[in-house]
Amino acid sequence: MNKKFSISLLSTILAFLLVLGCDLSSNNAENKMDDIFNLEKKYMDNSNYKCLSKNEAIVKNSKIKLGVNNTRSRSYSSRETNVSDSYNKTYSYCKSN
């Protein structure tokens, strides 16, 4: 009987940890999505930011990678924001004017 109780207790604890682990990961995903939406709202509604098409942003990103040692491109890359929505894979690229 002691073995049965131990096994039952162990399985209950494992099930609880499994449910807790799943719940924590979904909360993390929700928090990340909230952060992304807040970031998009901050930059999309700001008239000082210009949003680029995906192709324009790819070209800009490749220029930044090629000129890593250039201080001008470094300051440019710090002003560019790449926001990704992991659910529907849409992208927004915004750059400060």
UniProtKB/Swiss-Prot annotation:
GO CC annotations, alphabetized: plasma membrane
Compartment(s):
Cell membrane
Q: Where is the lipid attached (S-diacylglycerol cysteine)?
A: C22
Q: How does it sit in the membrane?
A: Lipid-anchor
Attached lipid, kind N-palmitoyl cysteine, located at: C22
Q: Where is the signal peptide?
A: 1-21
Q: Is the keyword Membrane in the record?
A: yes
Q: Say yes or no: keyword Lipoprotein present.
A: yes
Keywords annotated in UniProt:
Cell membrane, Lipoprotein, Membrane, Palmitate, Plasmid, Signal
- Protein family membership: To B.burgdorferi BBD15.
The protein in question is named Uncharacterized lipoprotein BBF20
At the highest ranks, the source species' classification is:
Bacteria, Pseudomonadati, Spirochaetota, Spirochaetia, Spirochaetales
